[in-house]
């Protein structure tokens, strides 16, 4: 069987940019590692990509009812770091992560923040 590889920051950014009318922003002047993905029209974030202590994290917005299901089903999905924990989740990006699920959650976050 093929060994699963970690998704990397560039792959996540590239996928986020496939969503219509989006752009990458680096809003934190003291932190060049963290990147937000935003809608061009309303400037709202739909993803926050962070590199903390050599670990990659992705924050996405989810429906609050779905958040509970995700957190109980996947140990790599936790309440969002430094954000509204009812609406946002952090995905710990490592080799255990389901790439298809990550892409679905990016799409949902994009739709929820339009």
Regions found by a protein language model. Name each.
Residues 1-114:
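Charge-dense, helix-prone N-terminal extensions
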């Amino acid at each position: 069987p093929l060994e699963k590889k970690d998704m990397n920051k560039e792959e996540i950014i590239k996928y986020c940019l496939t969503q219509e009318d989006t752009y990458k922003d680096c809003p934190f002047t003291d932190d060049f590692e963290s990147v937000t993905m935003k809608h061009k029209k309303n400037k709202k974030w739909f993803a926050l990509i962070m590199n903390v202590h050599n670990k990659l994290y992705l924050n996405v917005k989810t429906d609050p009812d779905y958040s509970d299901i995700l957190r109980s089903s996947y140990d790599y999905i936790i309440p969002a770091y430094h954000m509204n924990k009812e609406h946002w989740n952090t995905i710990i990006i490592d080799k255990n992560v389901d790439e298809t699920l990550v892409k679905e959650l990016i799409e949902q976050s994009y739709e929820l923040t339009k």
